[in-house]
Amino acid sequence: MASSMISSPAVTTVNRAGAGTVAPFTGLKSMAGFPTRKTNNDIASIASNGGRVQCMQVWPTTGKKKFETLSYLPDLDDAQLAKEVEYLLRKGWIPCLEFELEHGFVYRENHRSPGYYDGRYWTMWKLPVFGCTDASQVLKELQEAKTAYPNGFIRIIGFDNVRQVQCISFIAYKPPSF
């Protein structure tokens, strides 16, 4: 067998450093961009409102019963209730009305620890409004419930039938004495 060799001139450069030196790693960044001292991370240095820090109390500590979501706001009028119901319908939740004749707030009558009978479970008004597409249908049911129980508490709930959970709940009507 015959073999052929082709020779070509090659030029190589060798950088011979001293035996005691090591070439620097070129992938590191300069330390100039990093802070050299730790900054103060307390709340006063993060946000400033002109030097005054004030806290707002949003819930009175006595004389105010805790109800449901939005209960710290003034009572919702019909237009605001319609917007809340439209929101839960847009989310695809099923509206339902519940009422309570005696206690519209969490209370513990039978035991000091939380349980089934502590005011969280109310009586359902009719059936959930399956297939509801308009907020006026729910508000019509609300008016019927108000007429039937003028001294009761009424709340609107939105259920997610896919996750099988209650997603929204708010007081829609309180008796005049509250």
Swiss-Prot record:
What would be one Pfam family of this protein? RuBisCO_small
Q: Specify the transit peptide boundaries.
A: 1-54
InterPro entries with a match to the protein in the record: RuBisCO_ssu, RuBisCO_ssu_dom, RuBisCO_ssu_N, RuBisCO_ssu_sf
GO terms (molecular function) for this protein are: ribulose-bisphosphate carboxylase activity
Instruction: State the Gene Ontology BP annotations.
Output: photorespiration; reductive pentose-phosphate cycle
Q: GO CC terms for this protein? A: chloroplast
Q: Where are the transmembrane segments?
A: none
Keyword Magnesium included in the entry's annotation: no
Keywords associated with the record: Calvin cycle, Carbon dioxide fixation, Chloroplast, Photorespiration, Photosynthesis, Plastid, Transit peptide
Assembly mode: Heterohexadecamer of 8 large and 8 small subunits.
Function of the protein: RuBisCO catalyzes two reactions: the carboxylation of D-ribulose 1,5-bisphosphate, the primary event in carbon dioxide fixation, as well as the oxidative fragmentation of the pentose substrate. Both reactions occur simultaneously and in competition at the same active site. Although the small subunit is not catalytic it is essential for maximal activity.
Q: What is this protein called?
A: Ribulose bisphosphate carboxylase small subunit, chloroplastic
